[in-house]
Amino acid sequence: MAPQNLGTFCLLLLYLIGTVIAGRDFYKILGVPRSASIKDIKKAYRKLALQLHPDRNPDDPRAQEKFQDLGAAYEVLSDSEKRKQYDTYGEEGLKDGHQSSHGDIFSHFFGDFGFMFGGTPRQQDRNIPRGSDIIVDLEVTLEEVYAGNFVEVVRNKPVARQAPGKRKCNCRQEMRTTQLGPGRFQMTQEVVCDECPNVKLVNEERTLEVEIEPGVRDGMEYPFIGEGEPHVDGEPGDLRFRIKVVKHSIFERRGDDLYTNVTISLVESLVGFDMDITHLDGHKVHISRDKITRPGAKLWKKGEGLPNFDNNNIKGSLIITFDVDFPKEQLSEEAREGIKQLLKQGSVQKVYNGLQGY
């Protein structure tokens, strides 16, 4: 082999060996940069898990492999210690490996049964009994509504497990006919039951990841299928988290708009002012006024409201109402005369029905 070809072969061999040692590129699998936050990683997993789930891709022979790669990537990058080891040494550097069930990871985001991939929750068979649904109010802050977030909820869930012995199940009413004599029959209603393996309810701790989407509205529900009350003869019900947006000390929400009040001094109301308002994510909204600002005056800052739930690229407005803080001390006679001379404004005393707009 020529020296040049030998060198090329050696470089190719070293590259292949390095690739094998490094293992899978978990950042590429999730489609996030190496600087991604834990929220970015969770958001990417949740989106891709729905797209790559094997039940949604029955014609893809690699669907199961892709889904497993996605679960492995999330398991490592969502754990700070595993992520640190992976960033330093690659996949082979992980001490204890990553052997969690990727179905378990999926259920943390969607529940035991996930979604029917036609876009609707699971279809109910009316002949199969199911446990009660559970609705839980989940309080979220206005900051979370603005930027989105993932909330971890730890739930002690009763789960049906097999136990020794047998039990009666699927009990139902049936009509029985008994012949009493020639041409005489008696019909009675009896309870008939099947015999099933015995079960017992065991509490198991589950961690659920609830995604608070930007612009989420008060009262919206996030379902976790199969996470409700169990039924020993059928399916468990669903767990639904109902969003409850808590009141904010500075901003009030009305649709996609935000409202707030700003108090300025009498001097500022007359000569103008500059100030910044700290928004929900920490960025500054600058306000500059070089003209008279009357009490009750409003200022609209377009695009500084909340993101629209259906289209996060659209944002509402921030509406600012100004209050004027008048001096607390009484003015001296000299100060009064000075103000009169400065403003040169005569008496304006008008009585009218302000509520009707006259």
From Swiss-Prot:
Keywords, sorted A to Z: Chaperone, Disulfide bond, Endoplasmic reticulum, Glycoprotein, Phosphoprotein, Signal
GO function term, MF aspect, one: misfolded protein binding
PTM-bearing positions, type Phosphothreonine: 188
Compartment list: Endoplasmic reticulum lumen
Residues in J domain copies: 25-90
GO aspect biological process, one term: protein folding
GO cellular component, one term: endoplasmic reticulum
Domain of life per record: Eukaryota
One Pfam family in the UniProt entry: DnaJ
Summary of subunit composition and partner proteins: Part of a large chaperone multiprotein complex comprising DNAJB11, HSP90B1, HSPA5, HYOU, PDIA2, PDIA4, PDIA6, PPIB, SDF2L1, UGGT1 and very small amounts of ERP29, but not, or at very low levels, CALR nor CANX. Binds to denatured substrates in an ATP-independent manner. Interacts via the J domain with HSPA5 in an ATP-dependent manner.
Protein name, per record: DnaJ homolog subfamily B member 11
